[in-house]
């Protein structure tokens, strides 16, 4: 049996910050000052991502992974961030977990991430899928497939 190409390949990609946008208003651009609030397992990686995107993280509040983000904490941190000339930012994961409570704080920004894959690694990811789809299409076009399906 032929080993699928993707099981042998080591694909390297980078998670990057694509945008930092409040619920109400325009996106923030570097070098905007941010107060990072997160309830994720890797808050250091979040900070590095923001800094690599050119943002200035002036302060951060780290909660435990999956820990709820109470409204009173958001209100307090918004005031503290404002006093420092900064904006409060959360991850997409935390924004999702905050649910409808987030709508109460339209000035909270959400950092949206994107996966950066170079052309070589994109081919490692998608060429096998293209090959598999092509084989499936050819199979269903041939007479053997019609006999198999009937």
Where do the PLM segments sit?
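ATP-dependent carboxylate-amine ligase
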Residues: 1-150
């Amino acid at each position: 049996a032929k080993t699928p190409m993707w099981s042998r390949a080591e694909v390297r990609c980078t998670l990057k910050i694509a945008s930092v946008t409040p619920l109400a208003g325009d996106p923030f651009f570097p070098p905007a000052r941010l107060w990072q609030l997160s309830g994720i397992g890797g808050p250091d990686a979040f900070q590095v991502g923001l800094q690599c995107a050119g943002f200035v993280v002036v302060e951060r509040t780290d909660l435990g992974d999956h820990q709820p983000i109470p409204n009173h904490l958001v209100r307090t941190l918004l005031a503290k961030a404002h006093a420092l000339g900064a904006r409060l930012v959360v991850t997409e994961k935390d924004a999702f977990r905050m649910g409808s409570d987030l709508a109460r704080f339209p000035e909270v920004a959400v950092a949206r991430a994107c996966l950066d894959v170079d052309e070589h690694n994109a081919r490692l990811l998608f060429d096998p899928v293209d090959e598999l789809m092509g084989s499936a299409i050819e199979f269903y076009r041939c007479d053997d497939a019609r006999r198999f399906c009937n």
